[in-house]
Amino acid sequence: MGEVVRLTNSSTGGPVFVYVKDGKIIRMTPMDFDDAVDAPSWKIEARGKTFTPPRKTSIAPYTAGFKSMIYSDLRIPYPMKRKSFDPNGERNPQLRGAGLSKQDPWSDYERISWDEATDIVVAEINRIKHAYGPSAILSTPSSHHMWGNVGYRHSTYFRFMNMMGFTYADHNPDSWEGWHWGGMHMWGFSWRLGNPEQYDLLEDGLKHAEMIVFWSSDPETNSGIYAGFESNIRRQWLKDLGVDFVFIDPHMNHTARLVADKWFSPKIGTDHALSFAIAYTWLKEDSYDKEYVAANAHGFEEWADYVLGKTDGTPKTCEWAEEESGVPACEIRALARQWAKKNTYLAAGGLGGWGGACRASHGIEWARGMIALATMQGMGKPGSNMWSTTQGVPLDYEFYFPGYAEGGISGDCENSAAGFKFAWRMFDGKTTFPSPSNLNTSAGQHIPRLKIPECIMGGKFQWSGKGFAGGDISHQLHQYEYPAPGYSKIKMFWKYGGPHLGTMTATNRYAKMYTHDSLEFVVSQSIWFEGEVPFADIILPACTNFERWDISEFANCSGYIPDNYQLCNHRVISLQAKCIEPVGESMSDYEIYRLFAKKLNIEEMFSEGKDELAWCEQYFNATDMPKYMTWDEFFKKGYFVVPDNPNRKKTVALRWFAEGREKDTPDWGPRLNNQVCRKGLQTTTGKVEFIATSLKNFEEQGYIDEHRPSMHTYVPAWESQKHSPLAVKYPLGMLSPHPRFSMHTMGDGKNSYMNYIKDHRVEVDGYKYWIMRVNSIDAEARGIKNGDLIRAYNDRGSVILAAQVTECLQPGTVHSYESCAVYDPLGTAGKSADRGGCINILTPDRYISKYACGMANNTALVEIEKWDGDKYEIY
């Protein structure tokens, strides 16, 4: 028996110590710091108390359970080929996914060698490129990948795919949506996709906060992003100081249950009715910051007339908001008065931005409403800001270690943030080179990920904005079409990473797409046999980040979330050790691409003769790490806690704006040409625009969008209980926020330990069902009891779920988390009820507005009933 070895690694849920014995992982734990060698923690003095964080990291539930996913029996053990697929004969696309209908998808496949798999795929690549050109090859990854800056999708994936040539399916700004498509036009921050900066807000809040309004915000669930439970202690500190916590969310979320003093539950799609009523109260009672608004707002007077009903005849009173939202007028009015009276921070979304309300048909106006309220109370002044308690920690922002979005080994300046700093530090242009794309550009061919089915199954398609359109406010207004002029339609799909069926919208479309005869070849590169993997012709088994080398920083994304390591209580850089050999015949993504690069005769350019560990060393040397230790020292220790910078100047977010000064925060935007004399916001006027100049220009050019007018307006949700005829047939509004225990699909299914958490899945007759939460009044009216199997359905599909009867929703609202990893159709895939729990089958594929090409998956009407066992093969 061997000794236990402690190694280091990291994950989407935090860095860990990994304990390995005899070549197997036996446990993972958060990192505990060594006081003798690791840098001391920061301290904040506020209200006569000293605050300092624990001397350790925290991890999310899915990281705590990662061992069960590594050794899951649903790991793909070796390359496989669909039995009914003959690359030299009958391809039978109509039989893709046939095994799903028999509840035995493995039976569709036969084992093949890596050599045979690569030969088939390379032959198809070459055939398709000769016949149609590289634009006929489509690929896209999942949003959240295995952690590590070398292995991440912006890095290894783009390095290879750019060399091979492909059409990329751009990701919609799914975390930002309303902020991106609406908020950006009101206050800029395009380099953050419409979210505000958060620097030094923890100290500001500890010193000044009297109330925090958490609106569509559940930081105990979403960890900000990637940051485990780092911010939990900050809310404990604030509660100990007597700060009032108010929550506005249709569902009494996990953070609210822990710390809420008051909870408001509006009907789905009506949050902005509350924000208008609060603004109305402030206007009528003269309880807003008039001097601040006069100096910093554009179009406010005209907007105020609209709120007061002078222009449309409908005053946005608290009584009006009650009719829309179901929240009593007296409570809305009381909240407005307390807000105006106290030093109040607005926690809009879980990051200071984001939030499930932004992913809805009213998301644009909700985000603009949040900015409007913050502006009316003087955001940026001490005691008034937009802050969700998840960021704003006093760390060293000058120490340079790039996040995963800075491109890693790709150096792709078009599709990552590599061009800001990192590409120039990573590649010398003599011995090592980046891998840019001449196809995946605004002038080449690309498609929206949300419309992959339409592009494959249909003809021409048009949309606005290339993915995360953050280069400038007006970039998202640029029009695109598929196929791009001179480029081919898609004939091959190389699917990479986690499932779309549980994460996109109206996802029966994706299941149907795979069987379309225009799609000649499908490859799936995945770790687990889940989601849409059973639709592939060839399956390539990838490994987890615990089975390869990598390097990273705790929670550091960068890119459109700059400096977001401030989610964490310490900056922790990790060497991600190859803890074990890859399970079965699986390989790292880098080694998979290296195999293909060799057969495509581009291996020398792709790898430059380096393995992953050599790339990690090159990466290390391109950061500020060598200022503190050598590569050998880092390799031996495995992690580094970045010390505090005693000379750092504190720069509270938006304080510069409130005081009319030059911007002094370490943020990397706006560009110099987007400001006048380096003052003001990124907008044309430099002010918060209640009437957006950019949208006004768009309208004057003939692009009229009734769901995104130039003035911040109350626009009813287009699929709502009050304003939609569909409500007669489907009377329940469905909320589908991010899951509590898994990271989107990461952690769910896979026979992982998460399946045994009774608030994640419920076992009925030996099968673990996804949960739908139902108010007791709605349940009783339908004869539904706690634990019953129910069918949730609408015109888009049916999903079989376990009912959880609760009082944590108001009547008329149901709640089920998005991002199920299991797709288990009871009949024909894409045309029958799913019992895996893919709730996004029921969400609309309609864009958030005509020219705002984002998802509105929190806008959905459904009906529920006790399940009678039928397959419902009717779609």
From Swiss-Prot:
Keywords attached to this entry: Metal-binding, Molybdenum, Oxidoreductase
Enzyme class: oxidoreductase
Region (Disordered): 82-104
Xref: SUPFAM superfamilies: ADC-like (SSF50692), Formate dehydrogenase/DMSO reductase, domains 1-3 (SSF53706)
Cofactor(s) this protein cannot do without: Mo-bis(molybdopterin guanine dinucleotide)
Catalytic activity of the protein: 1,2,3,5-tetrahydroxybenzene + 1,2,3-trihydroxybenzene = 1,2,3,5-tetrahydroxybenzene + 1,3,5-trihydroxybenzene
Function: Isomerization of pyrogallol to phloroglucin.
Protein name: Pyrogallol hydroxytransferase large subunit
Organism, as annotated: Pelobacter acidigallici
Record gene name: athL
